[in-house]
Amino acid sequence: MPRTAAWWTHVPGGRDGHRMLWIALVDRIGSGLWASVSVLYFTYVSDLSVAHVGTLVAVSGAVGIAGAPLGGRIADRLPLTRVLTALQILRALASVALLTTDDYFLLMAFSAVGSLGDRAANVLTKLYATRLAGPDRVRYQAVNRTVANAGWALGGLAAAGALAVGTAAAYRWLLLGDAVSFAAVALLTTRCGEPPSATRTVTSSKNTAPTERPRSPWRDRAYLTYVASDTVLFLDDAVFKVGLPLWIAHSDHAPHGLAPLLMVLNNVMVVAFQVPLARFGATTAAARALLIPLSAVFALGGTAMAVSATGGAVTTTLFLTGAAIAFTVAEMLHATVSWELSVALAPDSAQGAYLGVHGLAQSAQRGIGPLAVTAAIAAGPLGWTAFGATIAVTCLFQHRIVRERLPRPALSVPTVTVSEH
């Protein structure tokens, strides 16, 4: 109890920081309810064919990609809490609208609107936390991610119970629960204060040209290169959603029940270790330095996947478990690194627009990731070795471009920061 109380008391951002954690929990519970059954809802309740469901999901996902840069750009011009509240209301209305029709094109339109709101809200929540937590943003990200994962798990468990019932009414109640969660989040957001204007805490007070016209991230080649490299580093997500389940399904030795157990292991590890690991990337310099061990962990994960195909049932299970642990550690380290560097590389005057463009990395990975892991599976053990090695090399590449992007802050701030802390 004392440790739990201390953990909760020391959340950066004060009362608004606590409120945003409740928002993350409620949001992810709702998302967990719907994400687990969305395809089944469209199949069994709306009576769509497999091809129609696939097209609907693909189109809504493609439209959602625009949400991140659009939301970030708007947030640089309007009060952040108002934009966030409006987006949550939009998500709630989109979910309710799905309940009102079985028309294919209307379902596609409502799903696309919900996807757009979802991606925009994700980026703006990150921007809010960045402005609110200031120099403690990495720790806040870790706490927020821990709470969000717990929310996903709770939502998934509730959805599993409804799936056991398997009726159309059960699916509708889950969708309604998703809508209610967004409405509750909108209400909670109205109670949050507007955070101070974004200031990049890695730079000193002698920033150059702070009042210049905001830069466009689309003309910033260095930042776009960073975003492209981060897209590759997000591929660990595809390992758990597609790679491990398919690899296990096609293995002659791995027990098929291992896949969900490894997903549980991933979730438990993130909840248990994300906050402790965050302290290793609490500054921009430390986050950049983490790219070196992150490179090794990605390579280790790919190697473990490859070796899992060379032995019997025990060897396969052990190495697949080892691969899951390695990719989970990589996921946690990369979450810390990505949060800090994406903010540190963004100019103060256009922080929202830049973080919106960075949000494209995760969106793009959702399309590229499944293709990358299925290619690795098709190539066999060598494919997994190449998969891990490619991400490892990308980590080293990112380590270099970050150094070149922030030459002055990286050289001047550590001396000040070390002496002050």
Please give the residue ranges for each predicted region.
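Juxtamembrane intracellular "pre-TM" segments in multi-pass secondary transporters
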Residues: M1-H18, C192-V232, T415-H421
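Conserved MFS/SLC helix-loop-helix module at the cytosolic interface between two early adjacent transmembrane helices
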Residues: I65-T101
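Helix-loop boundary and gating motifs at the non-cytosolic
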Residues: A6-G61, A222-N266
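Cytoplasmic helix-loop-helix junction between adjacent transmembrane helices
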Residues: F110-A148
